[in-house]
Each structure stands twice: as structure tokens, then as C-alpha cells.
DNA sequence: AATAGCCCCTGACCGC
DNA sequence: TGCGGTCAGGGGCTAT
């Protein structure tokens, strides 16, 4: 599924079922997702209480009473279902409907809350890993991640520094998780549109010679925070709508201004939204508005 | 070191 | 209906 807003929505949806509850039983229905699951994966989870459920970039991090951390990534198609006494929910449903195919239910947590938390992932680009909390700084998946775009540390000056001297495109730079963590293809397109910046522009143009932020960097920083904030809000509200009508699309897609809107009118200038391929991935933009 | 491209995998959709 | 090609929210690895 996910970029930052979807992962955050999933986190909030899982919290009531997991946080503060013991994992009575963990079951892995196959020995690998994207990577092989550790041999002791289920054993290290069973009997542990989830003391907190956090997020870093597009990763979910469940703190366990044992001192381990359960790291979870949804890849492209991963989703969770929470099956409780009062029915079934899917936190973080988004642009594409989640898989209904039970053959892709790969991992199940039976919580002491009575809820079953099921991880489903048809493409298996997602993965899970358990490691000691003490290794959080050296964990390869987390090491080198850039700042959280909604965190206090992230500002135009940080973004400018990270992009200074970069010869690659602004689009590619923003997708690089070392520059800023949590953006994906959708929100990069949307943020660039809101900032009126071309995806083809060199990343280095966010900084001047002293590596100080240009106006572009200021605009882009604001656009990133704004679009992520709005998307998280929409994720929250689409959750409620969604309990009734399973199988429909999410909510924030209606707020897309350029993503997935090739050939449709630009909401700002009335021109036409264009699509082209950049580093192997679709970029959607309005050439008239974005310079 | 920085950058671009390939690849992992399944399913949906489109044109023939 | 069936078949092949294309595309999809990510990111690790490898070759320049």
C-alpha cells in the first residue's frame, strides 16, 4: 500500500488492537516474505506484550516487553486486517483496494485483546524482522533514513543541505529515503505540484552556493508537510466510511491534483496533466504550472 | 560517491 | 474466453 500517510493510518488502526496487549500466538504461514523470516520469528513474538506501536518513515515498529522490536514494512501490496468480536476492519485502505485473497494471509498475531491481526501481501514486497531495541541505531533498514517530514527537525534548510550539489532530478531526490523519509511516488508528485516545481529540475536548485535554502526549498518544504498532513487526515476519515462499504476505494485519491490524472485538466490552470517516466516510475505533472 | 537500472512478485486491465 | 503486454504505492542490489 503505503507511503507515510498510509502507514501512519495503519499504525493508528492497529494501535487499539495491539498496544498494551500480549501476543498469545504468532503464526507465519510461509518462511519468507520479501526476505526469509528469521527461524525464531514466531517464538520471539509469542508471549510478548506490545508496549508501543510506532512508525519511522514507512516502517511500523512494535516495541515488545522482551526488549525486542518488531519491524514491519508493507511493501507495495501489504495490508492488515483486524478481526475482533465486533467485526473486521482494514486500517489504511487507500488508492488500491486491498487483497481479499486469503492465500496471501502470511502472518497472524493472535492478541490477548481477542483480536486477530492478519498481514496480507500478494506481491510479498513487504517484510518483517525482529531485533533488539539496543540495535535500533545500527539496524540496516533504518540506518541512513532522512528526517521525518512531519517532525520538528525537518525544514527548508535541512532539505536544501540534503539536496545541495545533487545532479539528479528533484523527483528522484525526494524519492530517496536518505533525503527525506516517507515520501513515495504519489506524494512526491503532489508536493511538487503544490510547490509549482518541475519534477525535472535539478535537486541542487533547492540550495544556493552556501547550501542555504532557496525560495524553492521553502515552498517545497511547506508543500510536503501540507500534503502529508491532509492525507493523514483523509486516511482517518476514510477509515470510518470504509467500515460500511468494503471494497471501495479510499478517500484521499479524490484530492489528487496530478497523480493518476494523465490527460485530465490541471486544477489550477486548466491545462492538461502530463505523465512521463522518470527513473522507471511514472511522474504526473502540469508543465504549465510547474517550473 | 552518486546515480541509473534491474529485479523481486502477483494481479488487474487493455487490446487483439 | 484466452493470451500477451503493461502497469502498480517500494527499495535493495549491482553496474557504471
Curated annotation (Swiss-Prot):
Family stated for the protein in its record: Belongs to the FPG family.
Q: Report any one BP term from Gene Ontology.
A: base-excision repair
Any keyword DNA damage?
yes
FPG-type zinc finger span: 257-291
Instruction: Give the enzyme's EC designation.
Output: 3.2.2.23, 4.2.99.18
Q: What CDD domains does the database record attribute to this sequence?
A: EcFpg-like_N
Q: For this protein, what is any one GO molecular function term? A: 8-oxo-7,8-dihydroguanine DNA N-glycosylase activity
What HAMAP family does UniProt report for this protein, alphabetically?
A: Fapy_DNA_glycosyl (MF_00103)
Reaction(s) catalysed by this chain, per the record, are: Hydrolysis of DNA containing ring-opened 7-methylguanine residues, releasing 2,6-diamino-4-hydroxy-5-(N-methyl)formamidopyrimidine; 2'-deoxyribonucleotide-(2'-deoxyribose 5'-phosphate)-2'-deoxyribonucleotide-DNA = a 3'-end 2'-deoxyribonucleotide-(2,3-dehydro-2,3-deoxyribose 5'-phosphate)-DNA + a 5'-end 5'-phospho-2'-deoxyribonucleoside-DNA + H(+)
UniProt keyword annotation of Iron present: no
Task: List the catalytic residues.
Answer: 2 (schiff-base intermediate with dna), 3 (proton donor), 58 (proton donor), 281 (proton donor)
Q: Which residues bind DNA?
A: 104, 123, 166
State the gene name recorded for this protein: mutM
**What keywords tag this UniProt record?**
DNA damage, DNA repair, DNA-binding, Glycosidase, Hydrolase, Lyase, Metal-binding, Multifunctional enzyme, Zinc, Zinc-finger
The protein in question is named Formamidopyrimidine-DNA glycosylase
**Cofactor binding mode, per the note?**
Binds 1 zinc ion per subunit.
Amino acid at each position: 500500500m503505503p507511503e507515510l500517510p498510509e502507514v501512519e493510518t495503519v499504525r493508528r488502526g492497529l494501535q487499539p488492537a495491539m498496544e498494551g496487549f500480549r501476543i498469545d500466538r504468532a503464526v507465519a504461514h510461509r518462511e519468507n516474505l520479501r526476505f526469509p523470516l528469521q527461524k525464531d520469528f514466531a517464538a520471539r513474538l509469542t508471549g510478548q506484550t506490545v508496549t508501543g506501536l510506532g512508525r519511522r518513515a514507512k516502517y511500523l515498529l512494535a516495541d515488545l516487553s522482551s526488549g525486542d522490536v518488531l519491524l514491519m514494512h508493507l511493501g507495495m501490496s501489504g495490508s492488515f486486517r483486524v478481526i475482533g468480536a465486533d467485526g473486521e476492519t482494514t486500517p489504511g485502505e487507500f488508492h488500491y483496494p486491498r487483497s481479499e485473497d486469503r492465500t496471501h494471509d502470511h502472518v497472524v498475531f493472535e492478541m490477548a485483546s481477542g483480536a486477530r491481526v492478519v498481514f496480507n501481501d500478494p506481491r510479498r514486497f513487504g517484510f518483517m524482522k525482529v531485533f533488539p531495541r539496543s540495535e535500533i541505531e545500527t539496524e540496516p533498514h533504518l540506518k541512513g533514513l532522512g528526517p521525518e517530514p512531519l517532525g520538528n527537525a525537518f525544514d527548508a534548510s535541512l532539505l536544501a543541505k540534503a539536496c545541495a550539489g545533487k545532479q539528479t532530478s528533484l523527483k528522484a531526490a525526494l524519492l530517496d529515503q536518505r533525503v527525506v523519509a516517507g515520501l513515495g511516488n504519489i506524494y512526491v508528485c503532489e508536493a511538487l505540484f503544490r510547490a509549482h516545481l518541475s519534477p525535472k529540475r535539478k535537486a541542487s536548485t533547492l540550495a544556493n552556493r552556501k547550501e542555504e535554502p532557496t525560495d524553492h526549498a521553502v515552498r517545497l518544504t511547506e508543500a510536503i508537510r501540507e500534503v502529508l498532513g491532509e492525507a493523514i487526515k483523509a486516511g482517518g476519515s476514510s477509515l470510518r466510511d470504509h467500515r460500511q462499504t468494503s471494497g471501495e476505494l479510499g478517500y484521499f485519491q479524490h484530492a489528487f491534483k496530478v497523480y493518476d490524472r494523465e490527460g485530465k485538466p490541471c486544477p489550477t490552470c486548466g491545462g492538461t496533466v502530463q505523465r512521463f517516466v522518470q527513473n522507471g516510475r511514472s511522474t504526473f505533472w502540469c508543465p504549465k504550472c510547474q517550473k
